[in-house]
Amino acid sequence: SRGNIMPGECENKNHEALKVFQQLLLNYKGDQLEAVTQLQIGEIYRELGQFDNALLAFQEIIEKHQESIYIDETLYFSAEILNKKLNKPEEAKAFYEKIIFNHQDSIYFTDSREKYRILRGDITL
């Protein structure tokens, strides 16, 4: 049945999806699809625990697609990886700060502000 997933099956599907997205990226470089494709690549790397690769994919969006509708999401995911997975709170703080000052309408705004304040030492949990 479809509900029974074998060990490693999800990881294999992630690797397959990664290949597809990387091919899309080659075919549509500079296109509007580039930002969302990079976001998907970053997400897959994040799921696979390849956090440095995820950050590289997200950095592409941050550098080349500042006006993308995915920029706040990209900044937030970058901050979360740096804060929770790589234990780099100072670097994470910079990404949370960008959301706070530049993306007040983001769904990540409130959470980013709270985490920024914690990292800055204003509040403790």
Name these PLM-found stretches.
Residues 1-125:
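Acidic, polar-rich low-complexity tracts and alpha-helical solenoid repeat scaffolds
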